[in-house]
Amino acid sequence: MQNTSFDNESDYSDDSDFASASETENRIGLTVPLELAGGRLDAVLAKLLPDYSRSRLTLWIKEGAVIVNDKPSQPKDKMIGGEQIRVTVRPSEENLAFVPEPMALDIVYEDDTVIVVNKPAGLVVHPAAGNWTGTLLNGLLAHCPELSQIPRAGIVHRLDKETSGLMVVAKTLPAQNSLVWQLQERTVKRIYRAVANGIVPFDGKIETQIGRDPHNRLKMAVVKFGGKPAVTHVKVLERYLAHSYIECSLETGRTHQIRVHMREANHPLAGDPVYGNPRHPCGDTVKEAVKSLGARQALHAYRLSFTHPESGETVSFEAPIPDDIYHLLSVLRLEAGLDSSLSNEEEWQDKFGADDDDDWNEDDYDVEVVYVRE
């Protein structure tokens, strides 16, 4: 069964519900300020309790966990100011799954403030329906028990289950606030490497609105209305007979953003089980190499740069391209009559030169390709 939890590349800053990992049922007492008079109860609570999503607060109201002036209430009830509200904070099912589980983690960097981890393909980031155990969050809680006191165990952005690569995790609440702010301000640099179907003809920018697919609620899609702005910069590293090796830089972090954008550009990622094209014409050897990826798409979060929350310095990290994607690249290069002996990122950079991705801007592109849905 397909996982509908959308454990993916989006940022928690987009849909924050920052409950503590160790959340237990407790009560909160509030007084409605006069400046919120005239507002609905659910809207007033959303302003008074910004750490919880409005949908979650609405559910608590309907379940009787919100008492106004000693009486049950409804989400649409109007407030006049001065009401006494008691909220029983109930742990969500996902928070009950926030338990430590020892697992081998590829820690790229760690200090007293942050952890940078290289997530393998196949590992879900966060407990959700269909994946309540064995997630990266569970492993982080075992590795660093104090993360139980940080909302979402310090996780501020996500990668899809079948996407590998770098993630940063906050070890303190101030660090988490800093990283969330950086994500919201789009100052965190995230560079992905991917193999796309077809000959990608451009270096440029894909800019759309992304929302739920109106025809399939288990997928995301480019939509005309009701979506969120999404911007991906694409650079072609190498072209083969029927595929391209590309680098994608995110300005925003929407659900399945790169996968949806490359599908919109008619160049879905190789091996993508949701947005890909399993009938993409290519040689038998390449088909076998794509199959060897298993359930994962050829997408890897290769480079991550952000301002360190404590030192204020810009820090950058890289995670080598995984063996399965390198095998696919070698097969593609061999089929195209190119040198297929490159076995790691250092050899790739020695042969082709290392690009300075930290200085990317729109002027770097030969052609700017913009897909805008208004």
From Swiss-Prot:
SMART domains the record matches: S4 (SM00363)
Main location: cytoplasm
GO molecular function terms attached to this record: 23S rRNA pseudouridine(1911/1915/1917) synthase activity; RNA binding
UniProt feature coiled coil, ranges: none
Gene Ontology cellular-component annotations: cytoplasm
A biological process term (GO) from this entry: enzyme-directed rRNA pseudouridine synthesis
EC number of this enzyme: 5.4.99.23
S4 RNA-binding domain sequence ranges: 39-112
Compositionally biased region (Acidic residues): 8-17
Reaction(s) catalysed (UniProt annotation): uridine(1911/1915/1917) in 23S rRNA = pseudouridine(1911/1915/1917) in 23S rRNA
Keywords: Cytoplasm, Isomerase, RNA-binding, rRNA processing
Catalytic residues of the enzyme: D160
Keyword Isomerase: yes
Record flagged with keyword Isomerase: yes
Record localization: Cytoplasm
Entry's family note: Belongs to the pseudouridine synthase RluA family.
Function: Responsible for synthesis of pseudouridine from uracil at positions 1911, 1915 and 1917 in 23S ribosomal RNA.
Classification via NCBIfam families: PRK11180.1 (NF008385), rluA_subfam (TIGR00005)
Protein name: Ribosomal large subunit pseudouridine synthase D
Taxonomic source organism: Neisseria meningitidis serogroup A / serotype 4A (strain DSM 15465 / Z2491)
